[in-house]
Swiss-Prot record:
This is Vigilin. The gene is HDLBP. Pfam families: KH_1, KH_Vigilin. Keywords: Acetylation, Cholesterol metabolism, Cytoplasm, HDL, Lipid metabolism, Lipid transport, Nucleus, Phosphoprotein, Repeat, RNA-binding, Steroid metabolism, Sterol metabolism, Transport. The modification Phosphothreonine is found at T8, T295, T296. GO terms for molecular function: mRNA binding. Signal peptide: none annotated. It comes from Pongo abelii.
Amino acid sequence: MSSVAVLTQESFAEHRSGLVPQQIKVATLNSEEESDPPTYKDAFPPLPEKAACLESAQEPAGAWGNKIRPIKASVITQVFHVPLEERKYKDMNQFGEGEQAKICLEIMQRTGAHLELSLAKDQGLSIMVSGKLDAVMKARKDIVARLQTQASATVAIPKEHHRFVIGKNGEKLQDLELKTATKIQIPRPDDPSNQIKITGTKEGIEKARHEVLLISAEQDERAVERLEVEKAFHPFIAGPYNRLVGEIMQETGTRINIPPPSVNRTEIVFTGEKEQLAQAVARIKKIYEEKKKKTTTIAVEVKKSQHKYVIGPKGNSLQEILERTGVSVEIPPSDSISETVILRGEPEKLGQALTEVYAKANSFTVSSVAAPSWLHRFIIGKKGQNLAKITQQMPKVHIEFTEGEDKITLEGPTEDVSVTQEHIEGMVKDLINRMDYVEINIDHKFHRHLIGKSGANINRIKDQYKVSVRIPPDSEKSNLIRIEGDPQGVQQAKRELLELASRMENERTKDLIIEQRFHRTIIGQKGERIREIRDKFPEVIINFPDPAQKSDIVQLRGPKNEVEKCTKYMQKMVADLVENSYSISVPIFKQFHKNIIGKGGANIKKIREESNTKIDLPAENSNSETIIITGKRANCEAARSRILSIQKDLANIAEVEVSIPAKLHNSLIGTKGRLIRSIMEECGGVHIHFPVEGSGSDTVVIRGPSSDVEKAKKQLLHLAEEKQTKSFTVDIRAKPEYHKFLIGKGGGKIRKVRDSTGARVIFPAAEDKDQDLITIIGKEDAVREAQKELEALIQNLDNVVEDSMLVDPKHHRHFVIRRGQVLREIAEEYGGVMVSFPRSGTQSDKVTLKGAKGCVEAAKKRIQEIIEDLEAQVTLECAIPQKFHRSVMGPKGSRIQQITRDFSVQIKFPDREENPVHSTEPAVQENGDEAGEGREAKDSDPGSPRRCDIIIISGRKEKCEAAKEALEALVPVTVEVEVPFDLHRYVIGQKGSGIRKMMDEFEVNIHVPAPELQSDIIAITGLAANLDRAKAGLLERVKELQAEQEDRALRSFKLSVTVDPKYHPKIIGRKGAVITQIRLEHDVNIQFPDKGDGNQPQDQITITGYEKNTEAARDAILRIVGELEQMVSEDVPLDHRVHARIIGARGKAIRKIMDEFKVDIRFPQSGAPDPNCVTVTGLPENVEEAIDHILNLEEEYLADVVDSEALQVYMKPPVHEEAKAPSRGFVVRDAPWAASSSEKAPDMSSSEEFPSFGAQVAPKTLPWGPKR
């Protein structure tokens, strides 16, 4: 074993040892020349005969071994081998096993088995699995499925045998899949196919196929016989390429199933008719007995690494030896360490077979060359060029580079390997002499910056110094960077990388908090101000957040010192902005605004410049008198003083300061400034200025004409005094349940307190935290009186009393129905008083009330009122057609609930009639029936209302009548509005949005007739109060639509203009810029002819829009055409090698030239007949200037191109490769098989010519006990 990795769940994450080294496979090429082929005797000299030691091949069982029964272990261990050619993950990345490692960890976690992996010399993978039997079997199945390449095969057995393969509840199939590590797919019962598909490894497929055929044979109605034949003699029975057993099956018609070499079974199963089966068994027995007598064995030692050459591709070499010599060659399993190969056959043929075995084993040799792993890439060369030269001369040599190992493995014919080894050793020596490497430590967090965007930095260093730089991936968190190449280049690259890293270590990132409102100002118009900052600090990167993020963080990144300087500079700029953002409002009488502005804005301009402020005046048509000044506080104050002084000079304006306590300012201003505005208007439009809230100042300034100022002052002081006296406050406390009682029904009680005392009583709102607090505000004496009254009421409420009253039992139900709704309302309204009615079933009329004395009395009074209402209750009928009932009720019955509350009545709607459609024809009378018999009198009267239309109202008579009127007012009415039919779809709007909006806005229903009726009448149904508004709204919408129709007709004017198609691209412009400008400027639609349409005139441009606009657009297009017709085109020869430089990155350079000279320059496309021809189009004088300019550029750039090409000749001389001749492979003369060379080539797809038989032999079983 070359390397072993133990995988456990604890250590697996740290396992990065390169368990499966990356193989660098090099395809061999045919040699150009070949010498005469050697003779067979020269290539394979005969070996001296030597007696075989048979004793070593057999191991005697201990005498005591059979007496002791083996103990069955609960934990078992199994070893599986995955050959190189069947490994799924051969090429692993340089940082570990990658996917294979993940898969193994997953298998261990899922199955609970323990895995150990090792790599054999032949690069095969050995996996040892330990654990309980079921865990090992599951792990094995997963390993095969996920780490080994999968093949598939089909086996045909009778359809009726499929169920026996599946077994009860699928158990047999599952067991078979676990045992063979395969996936077996059996067709469904309704599928006529009898093919069973097996997927897995080659060995697993053989085992599964054998087991399926055995199950089928057992169920076969024909005779089945099993014959025990030693495993070693199976190859003789099968014959070379299975021909012998195939002949027997064909001749006898018997199916013979020989276990594959990988299955450790000795019995051969025969299925067929009895007589024919007996013949087949007899023939097989005869062959077996004959071979058992005549054959003998010899054991030879052959290196394990050479076994695969003896086996050959798909066991082909073994079959060849068996065919030519009649000798069976038994190779130990690949997972065995044994190197012993057993030859079994007739004594006289063993010598020849032995010669062939050694010839095949020694036909190839394996050697290695010591070479540091970092030099491997240079030996291989760019795209394998260096190695290709070697493999062209030695095509049979396989060269293998293993990642992480300081050696190169060579495998192939001995002479070729020696020559190749010498060549590679010379290359290694030369590279060691002239190449160097260095490893440097740079913090991994800087690695991605060293690499640069898309590898720009690192690729530049590689190209500049001709070195290879290996940076570990981020996942490794490694700081080690390796530089390889020319010693001088390595040192230069090292110096530059360390300088970059040092610069990055010195770099820092700083977040600066700047209010987002200043970001646009700092950036400036078109980025001018930020460009100045970046020019001042070129090494600092400044990043502003996206405006959508609403972030205040501005990020600075760069060298520490520069970042600090830039931070201070920007902070100073922000401080200036903050200072300059102070704003004050100055009210100035409207008639003086023009004097403040001055002639041509002279006055205001002077104030702005001298005070360094921004002054905004209201628009002329605005009613506002306020002038806003923005800038530094001191400057704003100075500008305000100057503006006020202008106003003072112009008119008799007085200014008075009044001292009013700051706490009264808000109450004087009033809600949204209404109170102070009324004083200002009443006193001739004076200006009253209060100090900023929170400043603590008591000074209020009044400005205006002297007489008005005095009047305003008096009013303001009087109001302040009044507010002062009325702002006395007292807080009292009462339980929240008392509040409703204190307020009284409809606020009656609290209104009495307010009226008698003049004080305001404020109860807490639902969202207030302190629900006990009641606040009284007003004059002191009024507040004290109200406090006294309320405290007396609260004290009475705190005195709980119990009282009773008599209520007729017939009324009890009214109080307790709907879960005592009436009683709950009484309790809420009267301070939580408890009312207890006697139990149902008892005839008692005593009702008990418990609570505060006042509450109890009020509750008794309320109950008495309810009883009186019940006794005075009448029932009224209100006839409203049933179709209007839903509309009358309103959403969720809200309208009816409102009427019930307002009039204290009960309203009951009739049940809905199942079939509301009634025939207008008279009912047909049967013989013997009299008119009206069996019907109610009202039903027989056609004028009487239907039962389903009658709504019952219960309550006091006067309230019932009022409720009836209210109900009738809710009956919807319909009006018809005439709207032209062609406007209906616009009234409805997209997906009904228009009509839905009107219905919601006016609370009506609008019915538009169906399109097929072609009717102009739209019906509006709703409450009479809403109909007028809805009708007016609909007619207004019709007017709007008619105006839009007229506008559409005017906009649809079309105009055609004839323009030569060659000018169309110029009129359209780059990305449609020119034509878009014309469209937007003239508000028109411009349509160019479709190039693919042959029927359409190609010179007609159609313009659609208002007539005046289309004519203006036409004139604009014709002006462009006029300019284009004056233009000329000239071809100029320009060396194609400089085209790219003249065009520039993304065409920037050529666009600059075209804009500068106002010309169009067209370069030839790839594949053009003349690659140097460039066309310049424009006005004659512009074309000449542009041509002169680009010819000067050509001369300048061409000098650089010539120098560069001359340098390339020396740096990269041309490589001349000779023609490669096809390889003939390895050829010898006078070989034993030359006689059969005339036979046709073997068929690779034939299982007979390329079987898997004979590749391995079953391991010998040893008795339990100590090894001897």
